[in-house]
């Protein structure tokens, strides 16, 4: 019977710390760090910035000028001359803006349709 008295008590009594004997010291708690005023942490109330939108590749003819020697500049194309004439007209900017909006809306419409088709496939809805 003496052997049974020295055995470890059941776990339920260990959780309640009713076990007679040496107990572990409590875990020390660390003090809170002071907030840095004006530090480099940024404004925590400001929402995070969005990543930049991916843009399509736009070819710029000015990039080719570095490969040309002096005095070998290209003469302006007819389209560029016509654009210069249209800039003088007051309604050119409105027409240009409406045309740009039309192309942007078409691109957005195509992208939304592609995204919705992809979501349908992910959900298992086959067209």
UniProtKB/Swiss-Prot annotation:
Residues 79-89 have a biased composition (Acidic residues). Residues 1-93 are annotated as: Disordered. Its main location: host cell. Keywords: Early protein, Host cytoplasm, Host G2/M cell cycle arrest by virus, Host nucleus, Host-virus interaction, Modulation of host cell cycle by virus, Phosphoprotein. The major E4 form is first synthesized as an E1^E4 fusion protein from spliced E1^E4 transcripts, such that the first few amino acids of the E4 protein are derived from the N terminus of E1. Assembles into oligomeric complexes. Interacts with host CDK1. Interacts with host SRPK1; this interaction may favor expression of late viral transcripts. Interacts with host cytokeratin components KRT8 and KRT18. Belongs to the papillomaviridae E4 protein family. This is Protein E4. It comes from Human papillomavirus 65. The lineage of its organism: Viruses, Monodnaviria, Shotokuvirae, Cossaviricota, Papovaviricetes.
């Amino acid at each position: 019977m003496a052997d049974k008295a020295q055995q470890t008590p059941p776990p339920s009594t260990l959780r309640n710390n009713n076990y007679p004997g040496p107990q572990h010291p409590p875990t020390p708690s660390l003090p809170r760090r002071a907030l840095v005023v004006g530090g480099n942490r940024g404004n925590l109330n400001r929402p995070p910035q969005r990543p930049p939108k991916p843009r399509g590749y736009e070819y710029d003819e000015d990039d080719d000028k570095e490969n040309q020697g002096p005095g070998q500049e290209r003469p302006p194309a007819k389209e560029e001359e016509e654009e210069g004439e249209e800039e003088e007209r007051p309604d050119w900017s409105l027409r240009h803006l409406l045309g740009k909006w039309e192309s942007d809306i078409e691109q957005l419409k195509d992208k939304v349709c592609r995204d919705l088709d992809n979501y349908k496939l992910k959900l298992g809805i086959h067209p």
